[in-house]
């Protein structure tokens, strides 16, 4: 099948965000009032809207603090260039404000952007991107840096390319 679109992950694939997750998770534990918060995406998804909003606010503040320290992932940006002639989507667990700030400073653009505010489940994020791109999964490649990205792409039926760290 012909590749008609590429879906990229952000952190670890196109850029590296040096977030101190140990400190961030400690803040999450305080905010949520529970100790067992992993897997974080499932825990946050199960929260009521008000508490999830507080967690997202804390998360966005942590992301904003490290934005001056982000670095480019060479292999990921080379793949971005390789797929420059086809539509591209971005799926990320970063927040909308963070993504807007990152994309405004880099020369990267996407027809579709799906953030944690849209879904905290990677397979659901990919499915949303496919719907917005109006493409079948077998015509799309997902590019990510984690086994969870690969599993989500395969679950949805997309091809997958791993960016090495």
Q: What spans do the regions from the language model cover?
A:
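Glycine-rich phosphate-binding loop signature in dinucleotide/nucleotide-binding domains
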Residues: 1, 84-86, 133-139
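Structural beta-sheet core signal
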Residues: 89-92, 142, 162
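Active-site neighborhood of HAD-like aspartate-dependent phosphohydrolases
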Residues: 1-42
